[in-house]
């Protein structure tokens, strides 16, 4: 879907500024869903979000590294691999177009999981 914002003007295109209203970053809602999926003792070690766009869509690319703690942390970390691609995430104004576990492992601090996701603005 294409939007026209008459107030933007052509100078705006040259300066490469955002055109029209922008939605909020859905990263915080996505993190909340990932923590629920991992359990109460899930810790966010790192989370980044950057703009993403194609010819037809705009959204954000997210990379999240989670650390799981507790007696069954290894089992919960392994559970991230099962069904995350088909999981439903309620993100107002956005939807998860792609999500996957990129890497996982265990070190002296316990198991960790690195996840990448692409969220698209739902116009």
Task: Annotate each language-model stretch with its function.
Residues 1-123:
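Long, contiguous binding/interaction regions
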């Amino acid at each position: 879907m294409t939007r026209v914002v008459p107030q933007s003007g052509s100078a705006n295109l040259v300066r490469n500024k955002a055109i029209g209203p922008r939605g909020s970053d859905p990263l915080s809602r996505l993190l909340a869903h990932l923590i629920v999926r991992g359990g109460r003792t899930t810790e966010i070690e790192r989370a980044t979000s950057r703009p993403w766009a194609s010819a037809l869509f705009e959204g954000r690319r997210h990379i999240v590294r989670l650390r799981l703690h507790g007696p069954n942390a290894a089992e919960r970390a392994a559970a991230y691999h099962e069904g995350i691609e088909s999981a439903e995430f309620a993100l107002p104004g956005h939807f998860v177009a792609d999500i996957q576990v990129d890497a996982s492992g265990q070190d002296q601090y316990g198991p960790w999981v690195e996840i990448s996701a692409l969220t698209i603005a739902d116009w």
